[in-house]
């Protein structure tokens, strides 16, 4: 089988490595891929948002199955175009991808179908937003751009001044373009956060092992929000009891709601949850695998990934028994100095002996190949994942490998998994 994976990050690298385990897979192509993916697949220099370019390539190469991993091409409708050419895909249609593509849509969906989430209001006029925030006078308050914003469109304002700045940034300065035409103002929830990725064929929902993300750039959850600086799995706060409650009140109701709206969702549906004192609530939906959550979840998957993806496409997921290893995984992201703001590129990476460490996989994100060497090309450069019998073992191995990797201005958080370990001690 010839497989095409669309995307260029650590998530795509993790997907490709897992797909390679299936003996039926003869060739894997990545559009556009990166320096590390090039060792596991043939990289083709076509941007993930060049829908025509990808479609032409897929048709020309007689691709048997395509995995569309990032949010942008999903929201733009790449799956619909490829399917119309007879190429089966893993990923939601354009109509279904709106669950991530518009926060206004997803909040209204939850309200209509009684899915637990934070209280909210929607605005399209900056003046109205500001007078609403002033009148409520409740801080912190959460301000979200409606559309896609590379994971950076959510601002938590601690004061009226910060709220004004956020509204100006999103709605007037148009930092995220048309994504900021509308904003959602949400109540601030408290409690541990949990990421749950799930496979769904629009009928059955199979939650994957839970994970815990670390969004802030610096140790102690300080610094700016990022796309994610590391993850651990499973998430110790997510007990069997809570999982059952989420399945009944959130996961299945969401999939049924999408069916009712004639937007059947097939693919990976990501639930960003907060375990509040009043029970689990949805903070966000994503229409695809999370990054770097995928880098800890897929290494723990026992069942063949391609088999699952084909079952999702064929709507036969209920016939599969999807299993995960009874182990833990940890991923430490190594980033370029200055990330998530401006950073240098093109620095050569010295991997030391990291890639030969037992139970470790180094997933490439912002890397490129230059003159036979691997160099930095993005903000989040590598994700170092380790598995182990428990979280302590996984973290210790991941950090042992991380310490061996060197490039100019590299930095990583030293406290990935600290909250999870503290929760386990309780």
Regions found by a protein language model. Give the residues of each.
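ATP-binding N-terminal substructure of ATP-dependent carboxylate-amine bond-forming enzymes
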Residues: 1-94
């Amino acid at each position: 089988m010839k497989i095409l994976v669309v995307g260029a990050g650590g998530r795509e690298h993790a997907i490709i490595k897992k797909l390679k385990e299936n003996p039926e897979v003869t060739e894997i192509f990545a559009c556009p891929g990166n320096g590390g993916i090039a060792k596991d697949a043939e990289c083709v220099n076509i941007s993930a948002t060049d829908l025509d370019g990808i479609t032409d390539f897929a048709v020309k190469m007689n691709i048997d199955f395509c995995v569309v991993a990032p949010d942008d091409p999903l929201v733009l409708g790449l799956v619909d175009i490829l399917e119309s050419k007879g190429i089966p895909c893993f990923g939601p249609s354009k109509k279904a991808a709106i669950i991530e593509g518009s926060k206004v849509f997803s909040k209204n969906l939850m309200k209509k179908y009684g899915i637990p989430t934070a209280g909210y209001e929607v605005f399209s006029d900056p003046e109205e937003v500001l007078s609403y925030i002033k009148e409520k006078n409740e801080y912190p308050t959460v301000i979200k751009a409606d559309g896609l914003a590379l994971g950076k469109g959510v601002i938590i304002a601690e004061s009226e001044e910060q709220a004004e700045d956020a509204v100006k940034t999103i709605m007037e300065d148009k930092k995220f373009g048309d994504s900021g035409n509308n904003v959602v103002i949400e109540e601030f929830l408290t409690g541990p956060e949990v990421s749950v990725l799930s496979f769904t064929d629009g009928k059955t929902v199979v939650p994957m092992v839970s994970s815990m993300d670390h969004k802030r750039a610096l140790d102690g959850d300080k610094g700016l929000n990022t796309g994610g600086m590391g993850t651990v799995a499973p998430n110790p706060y997510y007990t069997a009891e809570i999982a059952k409650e989420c399945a009944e009140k959130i996961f299945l109701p969401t999939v049924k709601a999408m069916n009712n709206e004639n937007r059947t969702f097939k693919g990976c549906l990501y639930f960003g949850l907060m375990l509040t004192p009043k029970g689990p609530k949805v903070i966000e939906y994503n229409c695809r695998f999370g990054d770097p959550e995928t880098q800890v979840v897929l290494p723990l998957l026992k069942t063949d990934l391609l088999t699952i993806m084909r079952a999702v496409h064929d709507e036969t997921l209920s016939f599969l028994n999807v299993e995960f290893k009874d182990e833990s995984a940890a991923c430490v992201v190594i980033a370029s100095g200055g990330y998530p703001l401006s950073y240098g590129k093109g620095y050569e990476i010295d991997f030391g002996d990291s890639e030969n460490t037992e139970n470790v996989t180094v997933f490439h994100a912002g890397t490129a190949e230059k003159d036979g060497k691997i160099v930095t090309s993005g903000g989040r450069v590598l994700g170092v994942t380790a598995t182990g019998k428990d979280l302590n073992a996984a973290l210790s191995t991941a950090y042992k490998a991380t310490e061996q990797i060197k490039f100019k201005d590299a930095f990583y958080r030293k406290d990935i998994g600290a909250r999870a370990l503290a929760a386990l001690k309780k």
